[in-house]
Amino acid sequence: MLTEELLQDIFELADLMSNGDRELFLQLRDVVFASDPNQILNSIERILEPDSFDDFLDRVGESEKENLWLILIKLLEHFDYICVRDYKDNLEDFIYFFDRLHQVRNSGISLKLDSDGLNPAASISEWARVIDSKYLYEHFCLGAVDIDTDSYYLFFSKQATFARLQELAGNLGY
């Protein structure tokens, strides 16, 4: 059962991760408060790309809380607040998708223009450490959402926002 506190935390997470994106909020609200499961699926199918929708269907389970978390993550991905990268990603693709994140673009950062320290032979976790150190004094960090896959669900945020995101995710059991 979804509690009022859980819903508040989900909506605050959405607000913080999307910088108050109204379209994302409205999509999340429509899905969360839909009374018919088919209406939820139809809404999600209209929003997501076919591959992302298939992945969503593969992950849907019995837990309302876990399904709501999955919906939030998929919406954030769709609106470019999260990028999903395979653990074996190459640096060129990583940079391309990182640079597309809204928070990255809004901050004026571009790894394509400033990739100093990023070793093409390294892994995503090593690139994340470089990014964190590169933007430490600007108070940004690269975060990841764990949804139990081999992929990284990455987002970029202010460090103070990241602390609140961790707290909210912890409240939800993540």
Over which residues does each language-model region extend?
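Acidic, proline/glycine-rich low-complexity IDRs
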Residues: 1-5, 119-174
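N-terminal "domain-start" segment
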Residues: 1-103
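Generic serine detector
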Residues: 18, 35, 43, 52, ...
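Short glycine-rich, low-complexity/disordered patches
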Residues: 22-32, 42, 108-119, 137-149
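Generic alpha-helix signal with a bias toward terminal, lower-confidence helices
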Residues: 40, 44, 56, 60, ...
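Surface-exposed, low-hydrophobicity interaction/linker segments
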Residues: 76-141
